[in-house]
């Protein structure tokens, strides 16, 4: 699964890099924005979906509709970000907001469902809940590390446009 995703991203970036001389053409710019929309938008939309899942009460009847709608709205927001600013700024924005949403999910658990918070899950030995919250925190940290790497390696060298 994850290796397949890495292969997709690598292939798309290689295709994009190979055609960098064509960057003024509409097709190249469109593919660049669609790559942004796919590879940065999907993780953000997935994290947003999980956040909405934690916010909406389980007893709420049309819960699934709201969760799926939230996913697509977040994904479309990434497309809007892609087309409304430069790719460089868009990448920074998407990395920041994805990290923020990932960090917010465990915080929402503390506020809305205190018995399912990370500390209470540790005390009551609910390892599945602990694993999910820790994975979300680690993913949020990963996004911040990627953001820092992107800002220091690519922006300072002027390679990201």
Predicted regions and their residues:
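Conserved histidines in hydrophobic membrane contexts and catalytic metal-binding motifs
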Residues: 1-161
